[in-house]
Regions:
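Intrinsically disordered, metal-sensing/regulatory segments
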Residues: 1-276
Length: 276
């Protein structure tokens, strides 16, 4: 029987407790997004821990492609227009700052991976991503409750493939996969807390907030694009051989198809559900 991570269990319990506060504050959309994110990462982690020594590269490409395509489209359609609508210049600066902040955090995060900490580095990076994404989701939905669920669900869709990959690595390293309960709950923990905050009613501030959210999510989505290269994540997790150039060429077609389909799915949902 695999070990149960205490810090992972604490993360889950924190989400349960905060969910009670969210229900009393009528943060229904934030609560739904929080638990969808938890179910996506925890469920995919359970599958990843049982996947054995190899992972089917094509399935991995499609999982990342669908999620990143949906996320890029959602941020571009639902957040960018809101940011520019509040204030064109400040909204634009917010988008730029969000992308640059995402890049900076990702780059510095790789440096922190070399530190000696009593916590799995991959799980630590996932937790940081989840807490940041949750805080932004909470701010956006807490101050713009008329937004539909489609944006939030598309944004957290990448939690599934991320949890699958992380669990596969932890399982191969002989570490408890249950530590991923913390990043799985992380989105909800910070989303519920930040949704209780009220952003001052100012077009400039709202432009920066929504622009920053769009920029961060665009960076994260582009980071999850399925890059089929030697030494890349698909190559590493699927344990392809060094002479797998032909397979990687085939996977590039699937990468383009999956990201395109992810965007098309969001467009179809917007046409059929989000439109009055």
């Amino acid at each position: 029987m695999s070990r149960l991570s205490r810090i992972g269990l604490l993360g889950f319990l924190a989400l349960v407790v905060l969910s009670g506060f969210a229900m009393s504050a009528e943060l229904d959309k934030v609560l739904a997004i929080a638990w969808v994110a938890f179910a996506a990462m925890a469920g995919a982690a359970a599958l990843g821990s049982r996947s054995g020594e190899s992972t089917h590269a094509r399935k991995l490409v499609w999982a990342f492609g669908l999620a990143s395509g949906a996320m890029i489209t959602s941020a571009a359609v639902f957040l960018v227009p809101n940011a520019i609508g509040h204030h064109p210049q400040f909204g634009g600066f917010g988008i730029a700052f969000g992308i640059l902040t995402g890049f900076g955090a990702h780059t510095i995060g790789h440096r922190l991976m070399h530190l000696d900490v009593p916590f799995d580095h991959a799980a630590l990076e996932l937790t940081a991503h989840s807490l940041t994404a949750g805080a932004i989701i909470g701010l956006v939905y807490g101050n713009m409750p008329e937004l539909g669920l489609l944006l939030g669900l598309a944004i957290v869709s990448h939690k599934g493939p991320a949890g699958y990959v992380a669990a596969h690595r932890l399982q191969r390293a002989g570490k408890p996969v249950s530590v991923l309960l913390l990043p799985a709950a992380g989105v909800g923990i910070t989303a519920i807390l930040s949704a209780l905050l009220n952003v001052p009613s100012s077009d400039a501030i709202n432009g920066i907030v929504f622009g920053f959210a769009a920029g961060v999510f665009l960076h994260v989505a582009m980071d999850f694009l399925p890059r089929c290269e030697l030494g890349g994540e698909v190559y590493e997790v699927a344990q392809l051989s060094d002479d797998a150039h032909h397979l990687l060429d085939k996977l590039r077609t699937h990468a383009v198809a999956s990201t395109t389909l992810g965007g098309v799915v969001v467009f179809i949902f917007w046409l059929t559900i989000a439109q009055p």
